[in-house]
Each structure stands twice: as C-alpha cells, then as structure tokens.
C-alpha cells in the first residue's frame, strides 16, 4: 500500500519481512512493537515534511493495508488492557466500517519527543484507513514513553483478535 502526497511518501507492506524506517525513531519503535503484538511482519518506509503529517499518514496507510489484508469474514472486535511499568492502557477496536477514534491519555507534550497530538493523529488515521472504531483510554501512568508504547502494543493485540478469520459475518445485520 502506498500513499504519496505533497507532505509524505509512505509504503506499508504487510506480510513482508523487513525494516520499519520512517525516519522518526520514536514512531519506528512504536510501530515495531505494534507489528510484533499484531503478529505480522511488516515493512514500512516513509519520507515526510512534518511529524504531524507522518504520524497521520502512516496511520491512514497502515489502516488501508490492514483492511486490504482482512479475510472475507473476521472477528471484528478486539480488546486489550496493556501494562507497561507505571502505565496501564485499555484499547478496544471494532472494524465496523464506521471510522471513529477516541484517545483519552494524559501525557506531557514534548516529553521525550512524545505528544498527545501525534498519537491522536496516528489513531484517527488508522481508524479512517481501516474504517474502524478505536478507543484508547489511559487507566494509569505518568511516563509518556510507557503510556504511548502501551497504547501501540494494545492496538496490536486488539487488532490481532479483531482481524482473525471468523466463520460468520459478525453483525446482526448480516453485513458490516
């Protein structure tokens, strides 16, 4: 999956061994954790002008790539409560064709290069690309690195469940 704009050029390949090289070391670290807990190999490369554009467009492109790789019938829902040292973060996902994101975390902007706005842009982009509802809620913690990493790991775990093949369409309507 490729997304090219005047602000970014991003390639996401799911199921391919390789590196995650976005030229943003924090995002690389978070995406590596996400991929591990998702249980999928992925290769990601990116160039960008602003970090805001990078985090948002990576989310969109990753969501589109995940959507493209969904089985015909899939579990749809996934949840995780992810601890990381002082942090405890709840993540809930519904791949429902209804994009929405709620990111409720309390971190100090610019602590170690982390910003709430970047996490929110990534999650909103992921929700749009995957066409999913995503909720992330910080239950405890103060360290920005731990909170954001717990969120990315939790997203991976929740999506690992939500994207698993199912025997039926997981909707009382019969269609998502």
UniProtKB/Swiss-Prot annotation:
EC number: 4.2.1.19
Coiled-coil intervals: none
Entries under PROSITE patterns matching the protein: IGP_DEHYDRATASE_2 (PS00955)
Keywords: Amino-acid biosynthesis, Cytoplasm, Histidine biosynthesis, Lyase
Reaction equations catalysed: D-erythro-1-(imidazol-4-yl)glycerol 3-phosphate = 3-(imidazol-4-yl)-2-oxopropyl phosphate + H2O
GO cellular component term of the entry, any: cytoplasm
Main location: cytoplasm
Species in which this protein is naturally found: Pyrococcus furiosus (strain ATCC 43587 / DSM 3638 / JCM 8422 / Vc1)
Keyword Cytoplasm appears in the UniProt entry: yes
Family that this chain belongs to: Belongs to the imidazoleglycerol-phosphate dehydratase family.
Example GO BP: L-histidine biosynthetic process
InterPro entries: IGPD_sf, ImidazoleglycerolP_deHydtase, ImidazoleglycerP_deHydtase_CS, Ribosomal_Su5_D2-typ_SF
Protein name: Imidazoleglycerol-phosphate dehydratase
Location in or out of the cell: Cytoplasm
This protein's pathway: Amino-acid biosynthesis; L-histidine biosynthesis; L-histidine from 5-phospho-alpha-D-ribose 1-diphosphate: step 6/9
């Amino acid at each position: 999956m490729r997304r090219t704009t005047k602000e970014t050029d991003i390639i996401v390949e799911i199921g391919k061994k390789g590196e995650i090289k976005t030229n943003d070391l924090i995002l690389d670290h978070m995406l590596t954790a996400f991929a591990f807990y998702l249980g999928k190999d992925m290769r990601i490369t990116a160039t960008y002008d602003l970090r805001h554009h990078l985090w948002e467009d990576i989310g969109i492109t990753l969501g589109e790539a995940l959507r493209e790789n969904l089985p015909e019938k899939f579990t749809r829902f996934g949840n995780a409560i992810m601890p990381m040292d002082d942090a405890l973060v709840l993540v809930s996902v519904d791949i429902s064709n209804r994009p929405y994101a709620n990111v409720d975390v309390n971190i100090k902007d610019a602590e170690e290069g982390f910003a709430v706005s970047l996490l929110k842009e990534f999650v909103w982009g992921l929700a749009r690309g995957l066409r999913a509802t995503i909720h992330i809620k910080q239950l405890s913690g103060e360290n920005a690195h731990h909170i954001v990493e717990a969120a990315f790991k939790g997203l991976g775990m929740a999506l690992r469940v939500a994207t698993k093949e199912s025997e039926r369409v997981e909707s009382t309507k019969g269609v998502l």
